[in-house]
Regions:
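Subtilisin-like serine protease catalytic core
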Residues: 2-101, 113, 129, 188-191, ...
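Outer-membrane translocation/initiation segment of Type V secreted surface proteins
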Residues: 252, 263-314, 318-320, 330, ...
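Outer membrane beta-barrel transmembrane domains
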Residues: 742, 746-863
Length: 863
């Protein structure tokens, strides 16, 4: 059992409490009552009905009552702190002489403000005709009852308000009419409390009326000061404030449940006629009811009806009534409960950690959850019985009513039945504890004096990565549990999706090593990996497994290498366009700069795809070494990013390189051009791993790329321009650095590896005659090229950090065999020796458009 709630932790925060009274303003010259409640006060209702003067003095009755409920300590007087200082306080003025309509208006207005607890430290005049049981105005057909009780009935039964009454100060054996009202109209009792005053020595205050005929809804309480605050008027607000604190602890409780909780947890003082249910016990009250008793339930069960929350009863609960759980929420029973009635779960959940004496009936929409609980009688299941941890002991019979019933149990959890267990074709669902890794095991699920029938279905709770079957004997049900092959499961679910299948094989390889470790063999698998593997085994759906596989796969490390090659090709294409400009007549030595940007896609069936972005630039110098020959040197920098879908992650590659390039040949006729470059890159990868939890892993590595390109072609001149067919060959070499992701059970580790791709190109360039316009003498260009490369796979061998000896292949997007380029460009000679140029290049692959590169630059030619 967890630590018991401390009453001091509850101050009524968020609970609306009303006070029907008068004399709220008091006298600020002589007391601080109004100042003390200023922080709690939300509204003064019916201010026109205030009567500040009574018997020639400043009235302060309502002010004192309010301060007892929610007042703060104020420097300068000795009045103590209120019982529930967190409440929202509403003061409602009621005249000394009032009508039934005025009372109804006050109660209705309070209800409209959300007030469900109302303190009433007032009464009708102390006249024998209002004294039950024989007073003439206490009869059901009396004028007073017929006039006022409909408003009270509306407040209790329509609005759900709990009305707390002062028991009166006439030293009588019974209270007067209002405190005893349920004696006249029994329907009021569900929302009625009357409070008699006692002293610290448990003696009834000499002026206080005894509970008498109101004993069943009467509770005893002290005022905050036995000597100064005399009268039941000042004991009642203590109980009203206590109700607010219980309401804070159990916000779902209606007026009847609040009443039952306060009365059932009171300390029995022996004489019911004097003290009712006994002395208020706040410490017990905030821990839930202590009785389910027909005297309190008024003939039925205690009803816990709430949605969307988990609420706990800590007290040992006795009584002759039962419990009905309604609503979707969960009610937790911690105590040793001996109430004799049945526990009926019509909806929602009852969590049993303690014990229940009577029968338990689980309806179709109900759940009984147990972890070490004891059911001391029969359990009938038409919904779900869920046992985990320390299981459930049933001292009677267990009866499942048919296929609509489910028994859900965890591996290692035993349901023990002293009587017979009648399974009745119901369903069995077996869940695996989060921290329990399964290889192959046999567990006992049920032990009984007699097992009758069988389960109609047996399923694994998660249902994907382990299997369950049941064996039956005369007295028990045993479970055979085995781990499923992850690769086989993935193949059945995701056939053709290479990335997921590779990830599944990787996990299966690591799980095989984990099996060996769990079974006692010497296997290099960390405890953290076993824990994460155990949680991963609990994956509950194909969608969840897909997300786990996508995130675990590490395919981003393979696929992002394709980004590196794409990055290299984009830089090479931009430089090739620049080299082609060297063929123009009059091209002399000079220097140039170029900026480029691009967007693209990485995609291949079966793998996570990515949107890519590229930024970069080049700075170069050209030198004409002969009439037909030019050599150049350029400095290149680039920054490429890729965001992968399907939990692939994010990749960033930043590079700096040098290129040597040249062209030999006249403007028209045959030519040869070439480029050789080397680039130093740093690549960062960030991704989330959704395997038995969420891990953010990061890695950085240093790569090197060497690129070679050679081209020959022939330029044919025409009146309108020039046509140049060409062929080219290229070679790219990527030396990828080692991969070492940050610590994590499923983090990847891989040694460095190199990749090569050779390719051939066939293309055609078009160039217009110079056009003279405001932007300068401009030449337009266009080209198309087909590229044929060897379809390089970028896979590599890796292992999980938590199972470093269980290596596997990481697959990702490879380099395609067939690609093509189309481009447009323009160059323009400005005044003097400055020219500008711009180009657009589009790359196409098997999936369509894969890359867009925009470039623009300036060149200055030397004299």
């Amino acid at each position: 059992m967890p630590a018991l709630p401390d009453a001091a932790a509850f101050d009524g925060t968020g609970v609306n409490v009303g006070v029907i009274d008068n004399g709220f303003d008091a006298d600020p010259a002589t007391d601080h009552h109004k100042k003390a409640v200023a922080g709690a006060l939300r509204e003064v209702i019916a201010p026109d009905a205030a009567e500040p003067i009574k018997d020639g003095k400043v009235a302060n009755h309502g002010a004192i009552v309010s301060r007892i409920i929610g007042g703060q300590v104020v420097s300068g007087d000795d009045f103590g702190k209120g019982v529930a200082t967190g409440v929202n306080l509403y003061q409602a003025n009621q005249r000394a002489t009032f009508t039934n309509l005025a009372l109804r208006d006050l109660l209705s207005t309070l209800n409209a403000r959300g007030v469900k607890i109302v303190n009433n430290s007032w009464s009708f005049v102390q006249d024998p005709k209002y004294a039950p049981p024989d007073g003439e105005e206490t009869k059901p057909d009396s004028l007073t009852v017929r006039a006022f009780f409909p408003a009270l009935d509306e407040a209790v039964n329509d609005h759900g308000q709990l009305l707390v009454w002062a028991n009166g100060n006439e030293s009588q054996p019974n209270p007067y009419l209002l405190a005893a009202a349920p004696r006249v109209l029994p329907a009021l009792e569900r929302g009625w409390l009357t409070v008699t005053q006692v002293f610290a020595n448990d003696e009834l205050a000499p002026w206080s009326n005894a509970c008498g005929i109101a004993a069943n809804w009467c509770i005893s309480a002290r005022s905050p000061d036995d000597k100064k605050l005399t009268g039941t008027s000042f004991a009642a607000p203590v109980v009203a404030a206590a109700a607010a604190r219980v309401s804070q602890a159990y916000p779902w409780m209606d007026n009847s449940a609040l009443r039952q909780t306060l009365l059932s947890t009171a300390d029995d003082m022996g004489n019911r006629a004097r003290f009712g249910w006994g002395r208020l016990n706040m410490a017990r009250a905030v821990r839930g009811p202590a009785l389910f008793d027909t005297r309190l339930t008024l003939g039925g069960d205690f009803v816990a009806d709430f949605d969307g929350m988990r609420s706990e009863f800590f007290n040992d609960i006795n009584g002759d009534a039962g419990l009905t759980k309604a609503g979707t929420g969960a009610l937790v029973l911690w105590g040793y409960n001996r109430y004799a009635g049945a526990t009926t779960i019509t909806k929602g959940t009852v969590e049993l950690y303690g014990s229940v004496a009577g029968d338990i009936s689980i309806q179709a929409d109900g759940v009984l959850s147990a972890d070490g609980g004891v059911a001391r009688h029969d359990v009938t299941n038409s919904g779900m019985l869920a046992a985990q941890g320390n299981g459930l002991l049933i001292l009677g019979d267990y009866l499942a009513t048919g296929a609509g019933a489910t028994l859900a149990t965890q591996l290692g959890t035993l349901i023990s039945v002293d009587g017979k267990a009648q399974l009745g074709g119901s369903g069995l669902r077996v869940d695996k504890p989060d921290d329990s890794y399964v290889v192959k095991t046999r567990e006992t699920a049920i032990k009984a004096c007699q097992v009758v029938d069988r389960f109609g279905s047996v399923t694994a709770g998660a249902g994907l990565l382990y299997t369950v079957s049941a064996d039956y004997s005369a007295t028990q049900v045993d479970l055979n549990v085995a781990r499923s092959n992850v690769a086989t499961v993935a193949h059945d679910l995701y056939g053709g999706q290479a990335g997921r299948l590779a990830a599944a094989q990787a996990i299966e390889t690591a799980f095989a090593a984990t099996d060996a470790k769990v079974l006692g063999a010497d296997s290099n698998v960390s405890d953290a990996f076993i824990q994460r593997a155990a949680r991963l085994q609990n994956v509950g759906s194909a969608a969840q497994l897909a997300a786990a596989l996508d995130s675990v796969s590490g395919q981003i490390h393979a696929s992002s290498q394709a980004l590196g090659f794409q990055q290299s090709q984009a830089v090479n294409r931009a430089l090739s366009n620049r080299v082609d400009q060297l063929a123009l007549a009059g091209a002399r030595s000079g220097m140039w700069m170029q900026m480029m940007g691009g967007t693209g896609k990485l995609k291949q069936s079966g793998f996570a795809g990515a949107d890519t972005r590229l930024y970069g630039g080049q700075l170069g110098v050209d030198h004409r070494v002969t009439d037909d020959g030019i050599l150049g040197l350029s400095l290149t920098w680039s920054d490429a990013k890729a965001d992968f879908d399907h939990y692939g992650g994010q990749s960033r590659s930043q590079g700096t390189g040098l290129s040597l390039y040249g062209r030999y040949g006249a403007e028209n006729g045959p030519y040869v051009s070439a480029r050789a470059g080397h680039e130093w890159r740093h690549a960062d990868v960030k991704r989330d791993i959704l395997a038995g939890g969420v891990d953010r892993v990061e890695s950085g590595r240093n790569d090197r790329v060497t690129s070679l390109y050679a081209e020959i072609g022939h330029a044919f001149a025409f009146d309108s321009g020039r046509v140049t067919p060409f062929v080219g060959v290229s070679y790219d070499h990527l030396a990828r650095g080692a991969i070492d992701e940050s610590d994590g059970a499923f983090a990847l580790q891989a040694r460095k590896k190199s990749y090569d791709q050779g390719a051939g190109q066939l293309g055609l360039r078009l160039q217009s005659s110079p056009l003279d316009w405001a932007g300068g003498v401009t030449t337009l260009t266009a080209y198309g090229a087909y590229r044929y490369g060897n379809p390089t796979r970028l896979d590599f061998t890796a292992a999980f950090a938590g199972a470093p000896d269980a290596s596997f292949e990481v697959q990702g997007i490879g380099l395609p065999r067939h690609t093509g380029w189309l481009g447009l460009g323009a160059s323009s000679q400005l005044a003097g020796d400055v020219s500008w140029y711009a180009s657009y290049d589009a790359q196409f692959g098997p999936g369509g458009l894969t890359n867009n590169v925009f470039a623009a630059g300036l060149r200055y030619r030397f004299q």
